[in-house]
């Protein structure tokens, strides 16, 4: 079996986790108490969903997941919520005082008190797996726990499970709306620390998702529940191939192989279609060509940046539902003829396709309509550098005045870490710039470098 362990860190991670596991349970027909009426083999069994759920002798299905937060309130909601019987109490780990939006607290002072307990629990989960494939880490960049504790955890996971893939789903600070003033600091510190430990990071920006909710689902004031349910559909599409049998299956390592041309350039852009409310879906039939085209609209992206300003390095299309390869090939051929989509010249083909026959599931009482087919596109494009540039600029404005830095230094960080992290980010921007250059332009100055 190719099991995956999900780790949900901090408030954002835990709330995304709630939405994801709610959806997984609906997709597999697992009840909130962990029973699965449709599953005839009690205990074990080699069903595809066992990648995400372990099965007890009593026929209960337990998520292979850990929820961690440095303060109890968010996890207490899981402990008392609808799915309280789904999780093992030891899978929900909470500390007593929070990281107060401070990376240094999450990474050094408070994080280190809880890290061993978390790793211990991870080890137990990993021992239950026959062929652990990797970890999915859900967190935000802006919070103290999401940034600081995640980077600490990733460092430790690299030591303990060096060869296993580690994928991140990260909430990236939105360009306009902000939940904390020090978001740019936390984001840049965490990106710098986790860059070498993460194999692939899918970024999601709240503002982009707010806009999608407003525009496509007609929700005037989207709540975090609305946002998370939309994110969970994307996560579900990405992991569907691990949990169901399909025509063209994609496994975790396969994402990396196809999406990450260079180890540092591992930030694919996620796009999902169709995002449509029940009222509208009733009146239109969305063809494969239509949903494929929708994926190339900047409006449907999960991060605010414009791929028309960048070049694509790789592109992964994950279809689910009533889709046949013939339609997909036609849709891709049509897209390749459009000139607005530019690939880097060293990557001519660039489309990887996964097809899964399980149609997308709609959460009852949710905003998304039940549709016959959906697609999630993961593309590695140089345009995402815009997002980094935006963040770096905010960091520079604050750091020039050394604003708020004393909070970090007071928790045992050194100021040098800030400048080191910032230099790393500058290097990352440069990497993206160089990857986008045409290969023949870069030939003449090759001689000097080596």
Curated annotation (Swiss-Prot):
It comes from the Eukaryota. Its cofactor is Mg(2+). GO terms for molecular function: GTP binding; hydrolase activity; metal ion binding; structural constituent of cytoskeleton. The active site is at residue 254. GO terms for biological process: microtubule-based process. The modification N6-acetyllysine is found at residue 40. Some glutamate residues at the C-terminus are polyglycylated, resulting in polyglycine chains on the gamma-carboxyl group. Glycylation is mainly limited to tubulin incorporated into axonemes (cilia and flagella) whereas glutamylation is prevalent in neuronal cells, centrioles, axonemes, and the mitotic spindle. Both modifications can coexist on the same protein on adjacent residues, and lowering polyglycylation levels increases polyglutamylation, and reciprocally. The precise function of polyglycylation is still unclear. Its EC number is 3.6.5.-. A motif (MREC motif) lies at residues 1-4. Pfam families: Tubulin, Tubulin_C. Its main location: cytoplasm. GO terms for cellular component: cytoplasm; microtubule. It is found in: Cytoplasm, Cytoskeleton. GTP binds at residues 11, 71, 140, 144-145, 179, 206, 228. Disulfide bonds: none annotated. It catalyses: GTP + H2O = GDP + phosphate + H(+). Tubulin is the major constituent of microtubules, a cylinder consisting of laterally associated linear protofilaments composed of alpha- and beta-tubulin heterodimers. Microtubules grow by the addition of GTP-tubulin dimers to the microtubule end, where a stabilizing cap forms. Below the cap, tubulin dimers are in GDP-bound state, owing to GTPase activity of alpha-tubulin. The MREC motif may be critical for tubulin autoregulation. Dimer of alpha and beta chains. A typical microtubule is a hollow water-filled tube with an outer diameter of 25 nm and an inner diameter of 15 nM. Alpha-beta heterodimers associate head-to-tail to form protofilaments running lengthwise along the microtubule wall with the beta-tubulin subunit facing the microtubule plus end conferring a structural polarity. Microtubules usually have 13 protofilaments but different protofilament numbers can be found in some organisms and specialized cells. This is Tubulin alpha chain.
């Amino acid at each position: 079996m190719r099991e995956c362990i999900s780790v949900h860190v901090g408030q954002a991670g835990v709330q995304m986790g709630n939405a994801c596991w709610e959806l997984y349970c609906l997709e597999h027909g697992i009840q909130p108490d962990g029973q699965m009426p449709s599953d005839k083999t009690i205990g074990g069994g080699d069903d595809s969903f066992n990648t995400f759920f372990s099965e007890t002798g009593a026929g209960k299905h337990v998520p292979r997941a850990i929820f961690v937060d440095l303060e109890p309130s968010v996890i207490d909601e899981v402990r008392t919520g609808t799915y309280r019987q789904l999780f093992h109490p030891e899978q929900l780990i909470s500390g007593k005082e929070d990281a107060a939006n401070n990376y240094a607290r999450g990474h050094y002072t408070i994080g280190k008190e809880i890290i061993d307990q978390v790793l211990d629990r991870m080890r137990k989960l990993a021992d239950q797996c026959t062929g652990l494939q990797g970890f999915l880490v859900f967190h935000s960049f802006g919070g103290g726990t999401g940034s600081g504790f995640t980077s600490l955890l990733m460092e430790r996971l690299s030591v303990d499970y060096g060869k296993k893939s580690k994928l991140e789903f990260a909430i990236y600070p939105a360009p306009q709306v902000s939940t904390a003033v020090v978001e740019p600091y936390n984001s840049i510190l965490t990106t710098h620390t986790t860059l070498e430990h993460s194999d692939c990071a899918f970024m999601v920006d709240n503002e982009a998702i707010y806009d999608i909710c407003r525009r496509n689902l007609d929700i005037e004031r989207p709540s975090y529940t609305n946002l998370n349910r939309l994110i969970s559909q994307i996560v579900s599409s990405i992991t569907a191939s691990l949990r169901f049998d399909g025509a063209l299956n994609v496994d975790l390592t396969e994402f990396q192989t196809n999406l990450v041309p260079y180890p540092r350039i591992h930030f694919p852009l996620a796009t999902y279609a169709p995002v449509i409310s029940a009222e509208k879906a009733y009146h239109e039939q969305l063809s494969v060509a239509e949903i494929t085209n929708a994926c190339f609209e900047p409006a449907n992206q999960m991060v605010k940046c414009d791929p028309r300003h960048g070049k694509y390095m790789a592109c992964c299309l994950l279809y689910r539902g009533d889709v046949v390869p013939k339609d997909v090939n036609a849709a891709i051929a049509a897209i390749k003829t459009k000139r607005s989509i530019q690939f880097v010249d060293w990557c001519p083909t660039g489309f990887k396709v996964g097809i899964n026959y399980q149609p997308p599931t709609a959460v009852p009482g949710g905003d998304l309509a039940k549709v016959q087919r959906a697609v999630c596109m993961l593309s590695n494009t140089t345009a995402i550098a815009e997002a980094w540039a935006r963040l770096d600029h905010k960091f520079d404005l604050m750091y020039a005045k050394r604003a708020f830095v004393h909070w970090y230094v007071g928790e045992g960080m050194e100021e040098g870490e800030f400048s080191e992290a910032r230099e790393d980010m500058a290097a990352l921007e440069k990497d993206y710039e160089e990857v986008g250059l045409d290969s023949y332009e870069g030939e003449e100055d090759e001689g000097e470098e080596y």
